[in-house]
């Protein structure tokens, strides 16, 4: 908006203390464990090691399996087959029309 001044950055909070080095190192180790081995049992074990933290319900849920349910796969195959049939029909019609025009010229 014209005529409006840009906001300044938020002032520094002097009451905010820096983490002691041992806490920072512990958080780094926990973060490395979480990011390197990304599975629900490992995360809950790492969260259990953290003092004062409880594991969330979302981490307790089982991660979705990478394999699909066969019914969903069959439905998707049927849908792709129908799409392929439509494309094939359009291509055949286009070829037929182009042959008709080529015969005239």
From Swiss-Prot:
Per the annotation, the residue ranges of the short sequence motif BH3 1 are 27-35
Entry keywords, A to Z: Apoptosis, Mitochondrion, Repeat
Q: Where is this motif: BH3 2?
A: 80-88
Domain of life of the source? Eukaryota
Query: Could you name the Gene Ontology cellular component terms for this entry?
Result: Bcl-2 family protein complex; cytosol; mitochondrion; nucleus
Annotated localization: Mitochondrion
Tell me if DNA repair is a UniProt keyword of this record.
no
Which segment of the chain is annotated as a signal peptide? none
Annotated GO biological processes are: apoptotic process; cellular response to glucose starvation; cellular response to hypoxia; defense response to virus; DNA damage response; fibroblast apoptotic process; intrinsic apoptotic signaling pathway; intrinsic apoptotic signaling pathway by p53 class mediator
Q: Where is this region: Disordered?
A: 50-72
* Residue ranges of the region described as Required for mitochondrial location: 92-101
Keyword presence, Protein transport: no
Entry-linked InterPro entries: Noxa
Domain remark in the UniProt entry: The BH3 motif is essential for pro-apoptotic activity.
Protein task: Promotes activation of caspases and apoptosis. Promotes mitochondrial membrane changes and efflux of apoptogenic proteins from the mitochondria. Contributes to p53/TP53-dependent apoptosis after radiation exposure. Promotes proteasomal degradation of MCL1. Competes with BAK1 and with BIM/BCL2L11 for binding to MCL1; can displace BAK1 and BIM/BCL2L11 from their binding sites.
For this chain, the family text in UniProt reads: Belongs to the PMAIP1 family.
Self-association and partners? Interacts with MCL1. Interacts with BCL2A1. Interacts with BAX. Interacts with BCL2L10.
Q: What is this protein called?
A: Phorbol-12-myristate-13-acetate-induced protein 1
Organism (species): Rattus norvegicus (Rat)
């Amino acid at each position: 908006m014209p005529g409006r001044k840009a906001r300044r950055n938020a002032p520094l909070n002097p009451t905010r203390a820096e983490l002691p080095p041992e806490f920072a190192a512990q958080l780094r180790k926990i973060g490395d464990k979480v990011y390197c081995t990304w599975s629900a049992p490992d995360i809950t074990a790492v969260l259990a090691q953290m003092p004062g933290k409880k594991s969330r319900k979302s981490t307790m849920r089982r991660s979705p399996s990478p394999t699909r349910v066969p019914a969903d796969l069959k439905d998707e195959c049927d849908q792709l087959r129908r799409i392929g049939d439509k494309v094939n029909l359009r291509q055949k019609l286009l070829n037929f029309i182009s042959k008709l025009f080529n015969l005239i010229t």
